[in-house]
A protein has these predicted regions:
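Tandem repeat scaffolds
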Residues: 6-43, 49-253
């Protein structure tokens, strides 16, 4: 799936994703209301291209300041990427997990990327690993993932869960492993894929170090595979209520 961006004037700092009602400018707090703390000040309209080349606007987001993002990531500062468009990933570094085993965890107060889009024109492998987050969820609610192989491994959330609620996962593989969650105010320790929309994608778990719940409530997918293996632990609960998933494989569950 191909996306393009066009710079736009945005003096009101209004951002939205998927539908203009999902915006930081809203009455109440139904949708994410924070915006990034590492923005560049540059706003873009994001368009999805159909196979015929027709453009459909799907978001209006801010481009992050990548130099500042790299600094915040490696200096363990609080990171908010809400309502951003991210298509550069050098700030994560270039080491794969087996090259950093034994390194100390980096500790953050919080990391969120709600209503953000992560996009690569060509399939790209990226890692979020060896992180300890003190407060809130590792939150990708309403986010979009395009053409990525995303590994989220060796993550500890002291007072939160991993959230992909209402995310759009397009031609992307998400691998989860070694995740420990402290739970949140309303939910026991879990990884949530509630209400996701996925197409031509794959979601996998392996080498789980805690008995977590996985929630796919009302998930809608096309040509998407979910492969769940909790070893050496077991799953606490699995929820597929009202979900439509192309293929589910359970191993050692």
């Amino acid at each position: 799936m191909k996306l393009i961006t066009k710079e736009v004037s945005n003096p009101e700092k209004k951002f939205w994703i998927w539908d203009e009602k999902i915006t930081n400018k809203q009455d109440g707090r139904i949708y994410p209301h924070n915006t990034t703390n590492i923005g560049s000040g540059k706003s873009v309209a994001v368009y999805q291209l159909s196979e015929s080349g027709k453009e459909e606007q799907i978001a209006q987001l801010e481009i992050p300041d990548y130099k500042k993002l790299e600094e915040y990531y490696w200096q363990e500062k609080e990171i908010c990427l809400d309502y951003t468009y991210i298509d550069e990933f050098e700030w994560l570094g270039d080491k794969v997990p087996y090259k950093v085993e034994g390194n100390p965890y980096r500790e953050y107060e919080k990391i969120t990327a709600r209503a953000a889009i992560f996009y690569s024109e060509e399939p790209k492998l990226i890692h979020l690993m060896q992180l300890k987050i003190q407060s809130e969820d590792l939150d990708f609610s309403y986010a979009g993932f395009y053409n990525l192989n995303l590994d989220i491994c060796d993550i500890t959330l002291v007072n939160g869960n991993v959230e992909f609620r209402d995310a759009h996962i397009i031609e992307t593989e998400i691998l989860l492993g070694g995740i420990e969650c402290g739970g949140s105010r309303y939910f026991t320790p879990e990884v949530s894929f509630r209400y996701i929309k996925a197409r031509k994608s794959k979601i996998l778990t392996m080498l789980m170090t805690q008995s977590l719940s996985l929630d796919f409530l009302c998930a809608k997918t096309e040509e998407t595979e979910v492969c769940l293996d909790p070893l050496p632990k077991t799953f606490e609960n699995l929820c597929f209520v009202k979900s439509n998933i192309s293929q589910v494989k359970l191993s050692n569950a």
